[in-house]
Amino acid sequence: GAIPGGVNKSLTRQERDYLQEDIYRVIAWSREAVELVRRLHQSNRPLYDGFGAFRSSMLSIVAPDGALDLYDGELRARDADGRILVDRGDCSRYWELIFEEVKPWSYMKFPFLRSLGPQAGWYKVGPLARVQNCDRIDAPLADAARREFIDYGGGRPVHSPLEYHWTRMIEMLAAAEQIKDLLHD
């Protein structure tokens, strides 16, 4: 039978059991990585919060209930201060929300939120946007780490590129927790 997601076979019971043996270690390592990055940021906030920081809007997908979603969801955009600009945007009609500009000095295209225009409508994506755009993460340890990250910013978005690393570790922890749940399903 067909298996979704590009997987070419189901796990055997032996393969599943083998992976179950290590998943708790992976979760522990992921928690340690989140803690390490948190401690680094707290040890020198001026460096970690200021280095390369640039304020911008954020764009990501979230689940219909606002949870972190890495694959299929709805568009959410926030401005640099955290106010929601777009919520529950239809990904299949993204062109109504996002436009691209071409610059004569580059082969790249420069996307922006239509409602803000090309000068103010550019945005960041990736883990820093996803973790700050979602309302929660459906993995308890990762969600606690997300809340701690949001508290670190005083409830306002943070914009330093070094903070991408912290949010990458939060997403890694979420993935490990979700893998554990799938292995026990």
Language model regions located:
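Active-site bordering "gate/hinge" segments
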Residues: 1-185
